[in-house]
Amino acid sequence: MKEKGKTLNGIIEAACAIAGIAPVGTSKMHEFENYDEYLKNNTATEEQLEEQRKNPLNPAPLISIAIVAKGADVGMLESTIESLQSQTYDNWEACLAFGLDDYGSKGIADTSHFRVVIASGTVKELSDLINHQLRGAYMLQLFPGDILTQDALYTLAQALMDTSSPEVVFADEEMTDENGIYPYFKPDYGRLTIMNHNSVGRPLLVAKRVFDLVGGFKGAESFDIWKFALLALSNSKMSAHIARVLMSSKRRKDVSLSPKEIDEMDRILADRVDKRANAYCVEGHEMGTLRIRYVPKRTPQVSIIIPNIDGIENLKRCIESIEMRSTYSDYRIFVADDKRNEPLIRKYLDALKKTRAAKPIEIKSGMSIPAILNYCARAEINDMLLFINGSCEIQSPDFIEELSGLASMKKAGAVGGKIIDTGGNIVSVGDVIGLRGWAGSPYKGENDDNADRLKSSFTWLQRNVSAVSGSFMAIKAQRFMTVGLFDETLSGVGWDTELCIRLMRRGYENYFTPYAAAKLYGELPDYDDASSDNLTRCYDSFRQTLMTGDGYYNPNYDYAASEPILSIKPYKPICLNPNYK
């Protein structure tokens, strides 16, 4: 079944290339203009470091650090050792593994913290060997050249004391090469995001229970590090993300995933998804990333619901794009019909009904968008609901497969596709709750290109998000009914975001995918134009997330900007909301 799926996927990928969404390779690294200034304001001071030394944590669990030093550059190894010796946290041990031929003068004098293993074998074999030498309650993997900030271990250990009792803790980092310094500000853990790329990176502190369960560190290659992170996080009861740069490492060269590595991810994915579906991976848009294909064993019947409030030309374009481009067959289109006496619309709707191309559903005149969508969803219930703005033109041939597939995942809430405007600019790539004080899409209004890796991580990867646009959204029909449909009191804006918040509170996850794309002829409603009553309801619904920040958007980013730029002094997005007092 999987091989058939991959063959079909190859055909679909070729079609997607025509639509402009085929993999394009590697983007350049993103450089933050104010990173130096940010570090000055967000790095532990000497006074704070001294305070940590004087007041050690209690409890202070033993942290075991694995370092495979086979073939290591002496200077790089020494820099890593020096960074460990300068830690304000003292309860740690480091186990270094050397090959038989490269130990030489790399002796370690500090036997209170360091233990040395000398053995023959590959880096992978030494990594396996060192796993059995670690005695700590928590494990950390470093490589020669990694440099921890002086408070790194203290900060990681401190996070373990959180009331949620995390079993995995990770932090932001920076990578360096001959061309510059590239900080990586990460989102919180998301199960879809980490299946697409290693979104947690390092430093990564893992509890012994999880470490033993997944079989320890996997090796030193990028794929090995990703695999360990994915397995550790998926087997942990809780994780924590420290939104501070705690480590600097040498940037690794971007490489494509080998067929063997992709097959290995297939096996991992098969163990993690609902057994009622076939799931497999193909290489993603960016080199070294993956795209997840989720194919339910029973093809879902899909109800496509179009509110029809944007005129006959837009409606015809929308429906024709579905009919002409879709590679999916088991769907039916439903169009809201408010019985308006416009001859062209009446003639077109009658023709749709006669040819069974779509079924008009009579609604009352003056109903709000969420009310229209709810009414149509109740009237014709199939397995899957797909809401499409009538001003959208479908761009991706397999948009139904992509959206309904991800929406069929066990934990899936709402799934949204990419929306661009007629100029090729971004309208929606998943929404951040708190952007500009309300909610919005990163990079809105900017060209849909892969200018750099940061932008591509938002616009060209399947990922967890807090909210998606209701103008191009899929959700299981039963799940939609169970959580209570769209909130009809939010008549103008926010009804889609409010549903996504409710889904997350029920334990579901919302996903964005760039592989289902639509072009919008017109504009979506904006918070700037909403009524005061509408905004008051939005504020009540969003307030909790506005207070804490969107977990899938790094808190070091400035919520006032439409794209991720650093805030020298990070703040909560509620500060931007005009209703906040």
For each predicted feature, which ranges?
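C-terminal, non-catalytic tails of nucleotide-sugar-dependent glycosyltransferases
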Residues: 4-60, 260-302, 423, 435-464, ...
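Short, acidic, metal-binding catalytic loop of nucleotide-sugar glycosyltransferases
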Residues: 81-91, 162, 320-330
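Short beta-strand-to-loop acidic/aromatic patch adjacent to the donor-nucleotide binding site
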Residues: 136-147, 381-395
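A recurrent flexible, glycine/aromatic-enriched loop bordering the glycosyltransferase active site
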Residues: 182-209, 371, 435-478
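A short, conserved alpha-helix in the catalytic core of glycosyltransferases
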Residues: 210, 221-245, 269, 399-403, ...
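Glycine-rich, basic loop-to-helix element that forms the pyrophosphate-binding segment
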Residues: 119-134, 363-380
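Conserved donor NDP-sugar-binding/catalytic core segment of glycosyltransferases
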Residues: 151-181, 393-437
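A conserved hydrophobic helix/loop-capping motif in glycosyltransferases and polysaccharide synthases
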Residues: 63-73, 87, 302-314, 318, ...
